[in-house]
Amino acid sequence: MENTLQIQVIYFAKLRDLIGLDREIFSMEEGNNPSDVLASIKKKHNIDIGTNFKIAVNDEFSQWDIKLNNGDRLVFIPLVTGG
């Protein structure tokens, strides 16, 4: 039986504006990664935001396929574009 993880998600900039929150808690299945969390965010908030983000897990830049652990803090950092 898989365990449920509590992941704190922190939003910045455009993502925070779209969602209307600066953070929230997601309950995820053990073995999930940031890509899975992003899919849950898109579904819950009915938004299409792409994947143009850097991510940090527990204040360390990370990869999208890293396995998350209970209590992790996941931050989505929008990439700045312009010229």
Predicted regions and their residues:
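Ubiquitin-like/PB1-type beta-grasp interaction modules and other compact soluble beta-rich domains
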Residues: 1-82
